[in-house]
Amino acid sequence: MSVAKRVGAALAPHVTQIAPNLSAAFVHQALDKAITGVGRLPGAAAAADKQLAENDGDLDRGTHDVIENHVRYAGLQGFATNIGGLVTMAFTVPTNITGLALIQCRMVAGIVHLRGYDLDDPRTRAAILTCLLDEDRIKKLVLPGTPMEIASAQVFDSTLNTTLTNEVASELITRAAGKRLATTIGRRTPVVGGVVGASADAFVTWKIGRYVDREFLPRAGRQWRKRR
């Protein structure tokens, strides 16, 4: 673990100091908006279906485009919220956390929708939240299974929702706090700070997308065509 991430992990419990007025509830709000859509941003299923149609029904290519689009969104969102230099740094963290959560939830939801999972199913939603955690952290947590196993479970444990919400909120805040430390020097030149933040957000989003792509197999009835 990097120095920045270790410091971020230490700071994460102090949510009110890092991101005032932010609570774990923002995770569910981000997930809801990601699935239903917000403003001019269509919901996850509609956006994913469009990518699938543009690739002539090829699920592999459609999934690839969903990931690539959201990696770009994450980079742009990170750039926008990390510009401004040291003076505005304390005020941009909540926007960065909530915006990135929405982008990543939308990407994961789009992929699992293409694989045949119902986005209104609480099991699917719990699996989506699980995917926002670092892959190594998922392996260390005491969970009833992998994200795909959670989405496919015969019985849903409602207490899992609270556990996952808190874990995801902590993880997102840890990343943001660690990134703040890592980019402080860069922020003395605001554009440099923006580029560093954009790159970090895009890379984490790409890692999550690749993990989801590997983790979720198409459900029965979904035709799977690999790219040639």
Can you name each region flagged by the protein language model?
Residues 77-98, 191-195:
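Conserved phosphate/anionic-ligand binding catalytic regions in large, soluble enzymes, centered on
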Residues 99-107:
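Structural signature of FAD isoalloxazine-binding scaffolds in flavoprotein oxidoreductases
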